[in-house]
A protein has these predicted regions:
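N-terminal active-site segment of His-dependent metallophosphoesterases
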Residues: 1-38, 174
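Cys-nucleophile CN-hydrolase/nitrilase-fold catalytic domain and related Cys-dependent amidase chemistry
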Residues: 17, 26-113, 179-199, 203-206
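Short glycine/proline- and charge-enriched loop/turn segments
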Residues: 53-61, 122-123, 223-228
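CN hydrolase (nitrilase-like) catalytic-core segments centered on the catalytic cysteine
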Residues: 66-86, 153-256
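Active-site glycine-rich loop that binds ribose-phosphate moieties when present
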Residues: 123-139, 156-158
Length: 256
């Protein structure tokens, strides 16, 4: 058994791509300065959660992995800081679009890409409009600091995903996430969300780390979105468990 120090970054995202990248870089540097060896950023942190609305012009936000700004930033920082850095991004592969993770090793090498398997299609979590279900299968990455399995947000609700990665040799499970208020049901899903992943840790005897965003994100009516007006409040609560599922660290609902 070896000790690995992991950081989960919880941040608020804006409509300004460059500002989000600069904030992410600042927080990655801070985590590395505190000794973190694996640093997890939230899902799709480059922008506000654009899947709240359906806009055909947002398809152009997707880029091939080698052209994505966040991935390029991640490769640079991973090499400079000697950290493992999974980076969530909107991927274009020829004519198909995916919700993906690029796993970057501590020497800046791109180890590979995992494409999100489970795609939600609920009010204001309208991901099937933007993403095709992934074709990579679940993946485990053999990094400098250990073998990590990575699921993306809605993947976290399915025990089969965690079990598959455990059987593939994962030692740690990571879940970058963008989750918040329920637009139809008047309920707080956070405790259920967290307990579900605690169960994955307990059942598979490995630590689980989840990184979520925070803040209220609003959609204003426009011709491009068919006049939609809506809002989601992302509830943060990023956390880490040990291998028995016991909570070891948990962030607040509204602080970075």
């Amino acid at each position: 058994m070896r000790n690995v120090k992991i950081a989960a970054i919880q941040m608020q995202c804006s409509t300004n791509l460059q500002a989000n990248l600069e904030k992410a870089e600042k927080m990655v540097r801070q985590a590395a300065g505190d000794g973190a060896q694996i640093i997890l950023l939230p899902e799709l942190f480059e922008r506000e959660y654009f899947c709240q609305q359906r806009r055909y012009d947002f398809y152009h936000l997707a880029k091939p992995v080698e052209e994505n700004d966040a991935v390029q930033m991640g490769m640079r920082l991973a090499k400079e800081l000697n950290v493992v850095l999974p980076v969530s991004f909107y991927e274009q592969d020829v004519n198909t679009l995916y919700n993906s993770i690029a796993c970057i090793d501590a020497d800046g090498t791109l180890l590979g890409v995992y494409r999100k398997t489970h795609i939600p299609d609920d009010h204001y979590y309208q991901e099937k409009f933007y993403f095709t279900p992934g074709n990579t299968g679940f993946k485990v990455f053999d990094t400098h600091f250990g073998k990590i399995g990575i699921g993306i947000c809605w993947d976290q609700w399915f025990p089969e995903a965690a079990r598959c990665m455990a059987l593939m040799g994962a030692e740690i499970l990571l879940y970058p996430t963008a989750i918040g208020s329920e637009p139809i049901l008047e309920c707080d899903s956070m405790p259920h969300w967290r307990r579900c992943m605690q169960g994955h840790a307990a059942a598979n005897l490995m630590p689980v780390i989840a990184a979520n965003r925070i803040g209220r994100e609003e959609v204003t009516p426009s011709p491009e979105n068919g006049g939609q007006s809506s809002a989601l409040v992302f509830y943060g609560s990023s956390f880490m468990t040990d291998e028995t599922g016991e909570l070891k660290a948990c962030a607040s609902r509204d602080q970075e």
